[in-house]
């Protein structure tokens, strides 16, 4: 299966509770992460992480599924239609 360029948006509502689990998963998939930007948003008491990824649909589904199972984490993603 071909890899495609895409993004993952992660919102963390309970940073102290979730950060270790989220970072462990991102480290596990580090070879497929092209860029990462993470910002705390104190006004809403959450943190936002945006990832640019180069993954297959299966890899993306597995990673986002694991992230989505962590309490206090919301995740959305998309891949390009074409193989880049």
Where are the regions that the model predicts?
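Long, contiguous binding/interaction regions
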Residues: 1-84
């Amino acid at each position: 299966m071909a890899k495609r360029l895409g993004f993952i948006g992660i919102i963390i509502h309970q940073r102290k509770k979730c950060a270790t689990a989220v970072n462990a998963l991102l480290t596990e998939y580090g070879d497929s992460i092209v860029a990462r930007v993470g910002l705390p948003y104190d006004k809403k008491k959450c943190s936002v992480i945006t990832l640019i990824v180069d993954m297959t649909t299966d890899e993306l589904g597995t990673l986002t599924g694991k992230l989505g199972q962590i309490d206090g984490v919301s995740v959305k993603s998309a891949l390009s239609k074409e193989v880049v």
